[in-house]
Amino acid sequence: MVPNIKSSTITIDPKVQVIDNFLDSYRFEQLQSCILDQNFDWYYLDGINGDDNPRGSYQFTHGFVVNDSIKDSTNFPLISSVCNSLGCNKLNRIKVNLNPRTIFHRNGGYHLDAPDSLFMKVAILYINTNNGWTNIKGHGKVKCVANRLVKFHSSMSHAGYSCTDEKRKVVLNFNYE
């Protein structure tokens, strides 16, 4: 259970915003319960991103919005509340990533979500707390804490690092304007 604590914003860099307790506890618990449910549909992806895939890397994903089109209409109402809180005008992609625990922290590879877009932003909502993190190249490291959101411009190179202490690291990734 996530306590109903008021959100707080941390700025690790003028270009990166970190918001703890981004959603109220009720909405977050609904979202977390849906995504972590054993019957939630996951799809295997050989590799973590298209640019720099370390050998043996893989993840499971679930697309809610792909190429501006809603792909999971059943669960989209839970996601739309996050979009409203973010102030999204246009959705390009929303997907949830599940990275299994590894023996040591693995860098998933640096990448850009939308390098050619002037207006696209990235938001990552951490679904579970673990000892993994996101590194935003030249701007700092954001630890995986449940209900923490990090926002930055899509032209900023970033990489996810796996966890070693929990069964899985789960993040909800938004590309939006």
What is each residue range found by the language model?
Residues F76-S81, L86, K90-L118:
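Internal catalytic-core helix/loop-beta-alpha segment
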Residues G109-H111, S157-D165:
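Short beta-strand His + acidic residue motifs that chelate non-heme Fe in jelly-roll/DSBH
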Residues L98-P100, I127, Y176:
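Short beta-strand segments enriched in hydrophobic/aromatic residues
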Residues A123-L125, E166-E177:
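A short hydrophobic beta-strand segment most commonly corresponding to one strand
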Residues V2-K90:
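Non-heme Fe(II)/2-oxoglutarate
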Residues V142-H158:
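Conserved metal-binding segment of the jelly-roll/cupin
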Residues H105-Y110, L118-M120, Y126-V145:
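A short beta-strand-loop-beta hairpin characteristic of the jelly-roll/cupin
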